[in-house]
């Protein structure tokens, strides 16, 4: 079957099927990995309109835009995901990440403060609030958030010493026993 007859059989719409959506997503991800962001965006744009608001399609869209450092487009996608899935903390964090880069750190901080009310036990939200507080010069608040994050997930103890956003409190962290060495398992 030729390309022309295939399009005719599909009434000119050869891209809109669930299988095609999966293939388009795989292609988009391949282009993203190769840092061919325009091609990735093109593949995503060929996904049928009904599928474009599906979580996995939006997630791929977000990843492409983040990797391409297209912060304003990433922000739009992150907001859609956060509104559709408010119980998933990663979309709040993605929105804050894009806001920080496209608008301001204060706007990003406000989103995370709202997120913290809904996701009280999310260490990544607390960690990011620590970073934003430190960048603002509020070391006391930064330390409070960081210690809360570490209490929930010890991996943030090591990350804190490597994070440029927390450089202003590095000495305090070292005095508190933070280390870049992996801690032994408590078995």
Segments the model singles out, each with a brief description of its role:
Residues 1-11:
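N-terminal acidic, proline/glycine-rich, low-complexity intrinsically disordered segments
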Residues 5-6, 34-42, 68-80, 102-114, ...:
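Structural signature of tandem alpha-helical TPR/SEL1-like repeats
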Residues 13, 46-47, 80-81, 114-115, ...:
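Canonical positions in the second alpha-helix
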Residues 17-67, 94:
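Alpha-helical segment of the N-proximal tetratricopeptide repeat
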Residues 56-124:
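Alpha-helical adaptor scaffolds
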Residues 62-67, 97-100, 131-134, 155-178:
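TPR/TPR-like alpha-solenoid helical repeat scaffolds
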Residues 134-158, 181-184:
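TPR/TPR-like (Sel1-like) alpha-helical repeat modules
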């Amino acid at each position: 079957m030729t390309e022309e007859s295939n399009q005719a059989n599909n009434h000119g719409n050869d891209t809109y099927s669930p299988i095609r959506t999966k293939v388009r997503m795989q292609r988009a991800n391949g282009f993203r990995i190769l840092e061919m962001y325009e091609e990735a965006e093109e593949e995503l744009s060929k996904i049928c309109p009904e599928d474009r608001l599906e979580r996995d399609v939006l997630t791929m869209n977000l990843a492409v835009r983040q990797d391409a450092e297209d912060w304003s487009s990433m922000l739009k996608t992150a907001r859609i995901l956060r509104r559709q899935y408010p119980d998933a903390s990663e979309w709040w964090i993605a929105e804050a990440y894009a806001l920080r880069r496209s608008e301001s750190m204060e706007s990003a901080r406000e989103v995370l403060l709202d997120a913290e009310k809904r996701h009280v036990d999310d260490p990544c939200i607390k960690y990011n609030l620590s970073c934003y507080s430190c960048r603002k010069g509020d070391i006391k608040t930064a330390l409070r958030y960081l210690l809360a994050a570490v209490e929930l997930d010890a991996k943030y103890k090591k990350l804190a010493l490597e994070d440029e956003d927390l450089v202003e409190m590095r000495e305090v962290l070292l005095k508190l026993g933070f280390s870049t060495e992996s801690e032994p398992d408590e078995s």
